[in-house]
Structure formats: C-alpha cells, structure tokens
UniProtKB/Swiss-Prot annotation:
Protein family membership: Belongs to the UPF0223 family.
Domain of life: Bacteria
Family matches, as NCBIfam families: PRK04387.1 (NF003353)
Record protein name field: UPF0223 protein lmo1058
C-alpha cells in the first residue's frame, strides 16, 4: 500500500522516526499482529513527541484516511487486552 505518514515538518528527524515507528506498529497490529508490550512502548514514545490529545487525534484521523488503519481502535484494544499479542480484524 502506498501512502505517506502524517508528519509535522517542525519535528526533528528523531521525533519523526518515533512517530513513524508507532504508526508502523499500528500497521503490524492489522497485518501480522503485534506484542501488546511493544505497542505500549511505541505509544509511550509517541506521546513524548505528541503530548496534545488534539494533535494525536488529528494524526490518527489523517493516518486512518491514508491507510485504512485506526490507531484509536488498536489502542482501545491494547488498553483492554488480556493477551500478550493482538491482531486486528480487517
């Protein structure tokens, strides 16, 4: 699938990398499944770059429009997960 990640040009290269790694983890949750602990760690790092809820929501909406993958739905599943790995249903 060809699409671009919603990135802020004001972020440093390191910050962009952190955001992309989180969004790639969301992709893996849909495509292959992902370890819940790994995803939580990626989310914590993402929140260091994007602490504001409004910006987080905007990035999530833009990413879902581009990819079809919902970061919000994945994180809701992770929050309530009782297993060590999750895989989203298409």
């Amino acid at each position: 699938m060809e699409y671009s990640y919603p990135l802020n040009p004001d972020w440093t290269t390191e910050e962009m990398t952190i955001v992309v790694q989180f969004l790639e983890a969301i992709e893996r949750a849909y495509e292959k499944g992902i370890d819940t602990l790994e995803l939580k760690e990626k989310y914590r790092a993402f929140k260091q770059v994007v602490p504001a809820k409004g910006e987080e929501k905007r990035i999530g909406i833009d990413f879902e429009k581009a990819s079809g993958y919902s970061a919000y739905k994945v994180m809701q599943l992770v929050k309530n997960a009782t297993t060590s790995k999750i895989k989203m249903q298409p």
